[in-house]
Amino acid sequence: MKSVVIQQPNALVIEERPLPLPGAGDVRVKIKLAGICGSDSHIYRGHNPFAKYPRVIGHEFFGEIDAVGEGVESTRLGQRVSVDPVISCGHCYPCSVGKPNVCTSLVVLGVHRDGGFSEYAVVPAKNAWHIPDAIPDKHAVMVEPFTIAANVTGQAKPTEQDVALIY
């Protein structure tokens, strides 16, 4: 499969890589679309201190499950999914209080582990969220960035009288 790989800062190549196989609890996603985020640019330029090289970037992606690992229902095959790139342990204190984004063992697809700028990606099944057929692909790829705005709005709880600056 072809993958966009940042070998080191400012060095991008398209590389042929082996087709990944899903492990226990994982699914393999045939990627249809991926969004480009500022953080992908930061990794390319070497401005993300958490990125490890070489790295397949891309944390905003959408596709279809084409293989499942042990322990994952075969009914997931063929599902259209958006991928939550934040992989958390589910057991540490932040996870136990509903804040998996600050997990003590946090792994982010496209930063710490290869992401979605590839033809296929293996991700935990719990991070692959079913997308109804009524949602077009071009909108489904935007689920991850939309969740950022939705989360901030949920925490800020703005009212009609509030003024917000979006940067």
Residue spans of the language-model regions?
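NAD(P)H dinucleotide-binding glycine-rich loop of Rossmann-like/cofactor-binding domains
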Residues: C89-Y167
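Active-site/binding-pocket entry motifs
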Residues: A11, G35-C37, G71, I87-S88, ...
